[in-house]
Amino acid sequence: MKNLIVFISILFFYSTVIAETNDDQKIQGVISQQISSFQVDDFDKAFTFASPSIKKIFGNSNNFGKMVRRGFPMVWRTKVVDYLKLLIVDGALVQRVMITDINDEIFILNYIMVETTKGWKIRGVTIDQRPLT
């Protein structure tokens, strides 16, 4: 009986790790696809990765694109993207991302993620640290 409990515990642990890994990959994939869309000024496609609440705030991809160009130029024109830790903050999944922009300035951003019926979406982005050099 003790061996069965240990086996079930190990099985549960590994299935949780695998699920978390899959979420990590899916979340990073969404962020990567949005950043790739920004690189070619495809704001329509980039807007598809935004959560319903973000879509409601901006209304359309044109307004969303203006906000990104003005407020997040390092996301609009990136040079290097490195994924850091996926954290749970106040019940929300937050993917930390280190971005090097085209001027070789380094930024740490927090991508707040939400799971919807259509998959993972980006609910918001905050700049954790201004340029690191």
Model-identified regions with their sequence ranges:
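Sec-dependent N-terminal signal peptides
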Residues: 4-15
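Short solvent-exposed beta->alpha transition segments
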Residues: 28-29, 33, 43-90
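Exposed beta-sheet edge and beta->alpha loop/turn motif
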Residues: 85-133
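Short, low-complexity N-terminal intrinsically disordered segments enriched in polar/charged residues
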Residues: 14-40
